[in-house]
Swiss-Prot record:
Record-linked InterPro entries: Enolase, Enolase-like_C_sf, Enolase-like_N, Enolase_C, Enolase_CS, Enolase_N
Main location: cytoplasm
Protein name: Enolase
One GO CC term on file: phosphopyruvate hydratase complex
Active-site residues (renumbered): 209, 343
Gene name, Swiss-Prot/TrEMBL: eno
GO terms of molecular function: magnesium ion binding; phosphopyruvate hydratase activity
Length: 433
């Protein structure tokens, strides 16, 4: 038995200079797992609660000492003596102790940190890599794949202080033979883009996720700059590299007026008009994936969007589904979107995360594993992507060590697994196989 003998919680810093929760789970025999909770900037209203202290005199109210206290107190008391390999049992104990619908008592940041640390400790006890233990928990032992990365090379919206409304413009190295080559292609385009932006007199400062954050005249101009960068790097857009966008449309949706307000370019749209605006972009550029193309509450609009583009474009629900099986089931039943973004901390435990992945795959949805804009050096999502054979990962640009840490872990995993973890490129994207 992988008996838990101690649990330690602490307050550490994330990549935005805000506190977050880190947890250690110690087992008999000297085995240990450590994990940290990430934090989002553009968040869905139905996400599990990230518990903050609210003390304005300390970290501007963003301290997490209450969540840390829960880890070191109630959670530790309940889990010490339990088996770390019994992930579902551990997570359910924490969920039941919290007793709220959205983990508001302890905080999803507390529960998640312990949940992931327990999984890492269990993997250490078993003497296997974390991705292998996750595959076991997922009921798919030995089934792996290397994910196609969505690399966020131009940041806008809530992730940058600029005039670009759409939050993320991403490249996907679909023409690569393996993950390592895909990463190289992405890095080369990233550096090529820096030269393109500089030549046009734009800033090459980076946003929260490591992509550039230039003040561009329109959202389409971001795509145009990437097009030039891809060509200058020696690749063919649409063949070697495809494009993806995260609109994070809830951030520029005016609920009172019921319009989508692209203030950066002075344009306003109804729900239907914005769908056609996005469709026009997919006709002009090889965009194969659009995330959160409408406000999280605009289900009628999403139904229209799915009918309009769902057979050819991957439509990913992030704020729309918030890694929640109840909300995802509603989407599946009503023909809303065709893919889900998976973020641990939206739901707050590894077990619930795996349940969302399974539900999505069983319904024929694709799965994209994702970081948050507030990250740490913790690279657990790399193991999650491989261990669930998710197929796609979104973990920022080729800049900032909080992003690159995940890519480096994927390089190590590919080196270990070789042909046991195929890289399928464009075949992983809904509507493109």
């Amino acid at each position: 038995m992988a008996k838990i003998i101690n649990i330690i919680g602490r307050e550490i810093m994330d990549s935005r200079g805000n506190p977050t929760v880190e947890a250690e789970v110690h087992l008999e025999g000297g085995f240990m797992g450590m994990a940290a909770a990430p934090s989002g900037a553009s968040t869905g209203s139905r996400e599990a609660l990230e518990l903050r202290d609210g003390d304005k005199a300390r970290y501007l109210g963003k301290g997490v000492l209450k969540a840390v206290e829960a880890v070191n107190g109630t959670i530790a008391d309940a889990l010490i003596g339990k088996d770390a390999t019994a992930q579902a049992e551990l997570d359910q104990i924490m969920i039941d102790l919290d007793g709220t619908e959205n983990k508001a008592k302890f905080g999803a940041n507390a529960i998640l940190a312990v949940s992931l640390a327990a999984a890492k400790a269990a993997a250490a006890f078993k003497g296997v890599p974390l991705y292998a233990h996750i595959a076991d928990l997922n009921g798919t032992p030995g089934v792996y794949s290397m994910p196609l990365p969505m690399m966020n090379i131009i940041n806008g919206g809530e992730h940058a202080d600029n005039s670009v409304d759409i939050q993320e413009f991403m490249i996907q190295p679909v023409g690569a033979a393996n993950f390592r080559e895909g990463l190289r292609m992405g890095a080369e385009v990233f550096h090529s883009l820096a030269k393109v932006l500089k030549a046009d007199g734009h800033s090459t400062a980076v946003g929260d996720e490591g992509g550039f954050a230039p003040n561009l005249p329109s959202n389409a101009s971001a795509l145009a700059a990437i097009k030039v960068a891809v060509a200058n790097a020696g690749y063919e857009l649409g063949k070697d590299i495809t494009l993806a966008m995260d609109c994070a449309a809830s951030e520029f949706y005016d609920k009172e007026a019921n319009i989508y307000d692209l203030k950066g370019e002075g344009k306003k749209f109804t729900s239907e008009e914005f769908n056609f605006f996005l469709q026009d972009l997919t006709k002009e550029y090889p965009i194969v994936s659009i995330e959160d193309g409408l406000d999280e509450s605009d289900w009628d609009g999403f139904a229209h969007q799915t009918k309009l583009m769902g057979d050819k474009i991957q439509l990913v629900g992030d704020d729309l589904f918030v890694t929640n099986t109840k909300i995802l089931k509603r989407g599946i039943d009503n023909g809303i979107a065709n893919s889900i973004l998976i973020k641990f901390n939206q739901i707050g435990s590894l077990t619930e995360t795996l349940a969302a992945i399974k539900m999505a795959k069983d319904a024929g949805f694709t799965v994209v594993i994702s970081h948050r804009s507030g990250e740490t050096e913790d690279a657990t999502i790399a193991d999650l992507a491989v261990g669930t054979a998710a197929g796609q990962i979104k973990t920022g640009s080729l800049s900032r060590s909080d992003r690159v840490a995940k890519y480096n872990q994927l390089l190590r995993i590919e080196e270990q697994l070789g042909e046991k973890a195929p890289y399928k490129g464009l075949k992983e994207v809904k509507g493109q196989a």
